[in-house]
């Protein structure tokens, strides 16, 4: 089971890894973006997109070269924002189309590779996401009860990962002195953990003496600050 280390995989990999491993698959995650990934992406890209999406070409080609049987890359239709006042929070058009369009551009079917791209409507909650993942049972030829059990393993993996990340954040905050300066990096997960997309900013800040933490390390996701950032229409 090939998994390109791109976009929201930086968030969903703990779930996906536990899910597919529980079903007996060997999970192959591509290496972090490198100069080779960039070179492949520049050669293979067939349209102008944002840089994070363009890098999918290189990551997917690396999985093709490794001769995986499946490539897992979800389609993100809507996002979940706890305090949003709009009816639906849609992902950008590339998140909705990149998996299928790039798989087609690289013609993975002719190479014997099947794309698994469940549609995640995250603003409908965990049940909708679970339904999308269970829909893979037919493609994989695995009974739904087995997939449901694997999905529970995925959910537990997410809880453990989230707790571990927040524990790291609390440990850092506990070491702070009153005059310490801490910078919180607020971006998508891939904007922090991808070594190319983060442009070395975390390391640069550390070199300048700042303590750096990401939004995922902070347990304040339920805090409602919408009144401070509401847009008047």
Language-model regions, residue ranges each:
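An N-terminal assembly and electron-transfer interface module characteristic of large anaerobic redox
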Residues: 1-233
């Amino acid at each position: 089971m090939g998994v390109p280390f791109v976009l929201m995989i930086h968030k969903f990999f703990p779930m996906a890894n536990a899910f597919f491993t529980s079903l007996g698959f060997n999970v192959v995650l591509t290496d972090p973006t490198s100069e080779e990934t960039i070179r492949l992406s520049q050669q293979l890209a067939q349209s102008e997109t944002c840089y994070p999406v363009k890098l999918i070409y290189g990551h997917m080609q690396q999985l093709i070269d490794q001769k995986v049987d499946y490539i897992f890359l979800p389609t993100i239709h809507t996002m979940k924002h706890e305090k949003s006042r709009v009816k639906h929070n849609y992902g950008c058009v590339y998140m909705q189309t990149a998996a299928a369009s790039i798989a087609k551009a690289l013609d993975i079917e002719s190479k014997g590779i099947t794309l698994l791209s469940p549609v995640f409507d995250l603003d409908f909650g965990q049940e909708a996401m679970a339904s999308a993942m269970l829909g893979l049972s037919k493609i994989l030829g695995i009974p739904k009860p087995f997939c449901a059990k694997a999905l529970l393993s995925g959910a537990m993996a997410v809880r453990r990962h989230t707790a571990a990340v927040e524990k790291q954040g609390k440990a850092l905050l506990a070491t702070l002195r009153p005059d310490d300066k801490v910078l919180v990096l607020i971006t998508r997960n891939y904007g922090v953990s991808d070594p190319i997309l983060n442009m070395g900013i975390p390391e640069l800040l550390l070199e300048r003496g700042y303590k750096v933490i990401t939004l995922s390390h902070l347990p304040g996701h339920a805090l409602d600050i919408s009144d401070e950032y509401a847009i008047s229409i």
